[in-house]
Curated annotation (Swiss-Prot):
Protein name as catalogued: 2,3,4,5-tetrahydropyridine-2,6-dicarboxylate N-succinyltransferase
One annotated Gene Ontology cellular component of this protein: cytoplasm
GO molecular function, a single term: nucleotidyltransferase activity
Enzyme nomenclature, EC number: 2.3.1.117
Gene: dapD
Phylogenetic placement of the source organism: Bacteria, Pseudomonadati, Pseudomonadota, Alphaproteobacteria, Rhodobacterales
Length: 274
């Protein structure tokens, strides 16, 4: 099916989603499976950049959700000491052999988890981390230990997600658009970006920066307060702002624009990408 045909089929299926079960066959199952496969291969994305704007393919997100209706719970093997898991979503790596790994061209360290319908591009390094379904991780990115890439999140090229970073998903609670980290960003350890916020190209978030839709993002130089988006080339740290009754509340502070000194501290190590 073409993307237009898939979209039409998914939108129709969405209207009768309460009637869809693991026993459902025919066009609904075919359309959902084809969409999940396209997401898994990276030929379709939940969100794609058009110029400077991001366009969300809401129907692709709906297909991810419909996949839960079509699949029954089953045992997943491979747990410690012969243990198992109980889930509906297959591993991206299910039934992979050396040929599939060679073709994929990324590195997956033992104990990383990637669920089917997430796309991982060539040159990516996955430390023991978690990438949820529908996500897109572009070339040359490092997903460091205990980092989480949430459902349908979009991660750009040559991004570094440091240890324990959380990139929010869109499925629960439901969000209109995915969280997006654009190319060449560095996200410091234990930082969180959630609720469909966007970190624009080349930005650096220091350790422990938390950004959601209601988080004030303050430009120290101009005093401007913004929400939901970090401008390109920003260096952001955790801060606070005065509120009512002498109480200070958390905010994220743009302390400067990325310069050569910042780049020297946050540049990726090509030796780790070979």
């Amino acid at each position: 099916m073409s993307n237009d045909a898939l979209e039409a089929a998914i939108e129709s299926a969405w209207e009768i989603r309460d009637q869809i079960t693991p026993a459902t066959r025919g066009e609904v199952r075919d359309a959902v499976e084809a969409t999940l496969e396209a997401l898994d291969k990276g030929v379709l994305r939940v969100a794609e950049k058009r110029g400077s704007d991001w366009h969300v393919n809401q129907w692709a997100k709906k297909a991810v959700l419909l996949g839960f209706r079509l699949k029954d719970m089953e045992v997943h093997m491979g747990g410690p000491q012969g243990g198992t898991w109980w889930d509906k979503v297959d591993s991206k790596f299910a039934h992979w052999g050396e040929a599939q790994w060679q073709a994929a061209g990324f590195r997956a360290v033992p104990n990383c988890v990637v669920r089917r319908s997430a796309y991982i591009a060539k040159g990516v390094v996955l430390m023991p981390s978690f990438v949820n379904l529908g996500a897109y991780v572009d070339e040359g990115t490092m997903v460091d230990t205990w980092a989480t890439v949430g459902s349908c999140a979009q991660i750009g090229k040559n991004v570094h997600l440091s240890g324990g970073v959380g990139i929010g998903g869109v499925l629960e609670p439901m969000q209109a658009g995915p969280t997006i980290i654009e190319d060449n960003c560095f996200i410091g350890a234990r930082s969180e970006v959630v609720e469909g916020c966007i970190v624009r190209e080349g930005s650096v978030l220091g350790m422990g920066v938390f950004i959601g839709k209601s988080t004030k993002i303050v430009d120290r130089e101009t005093g401007e307060v913004m929400y939901g988006e970090v401008p390109a080339g920003s260096v952001v740290v955790a801060g606070s702002m005065p509120s009512k009754n002498g109480v200070n509340l958390y905010c994220a502070v743009i302390v400067k624009r990325v310069d050569a000194q910042t780049r020297s501290k946050t540049s990726i190590n090509e030796l780790l990408r070979d």
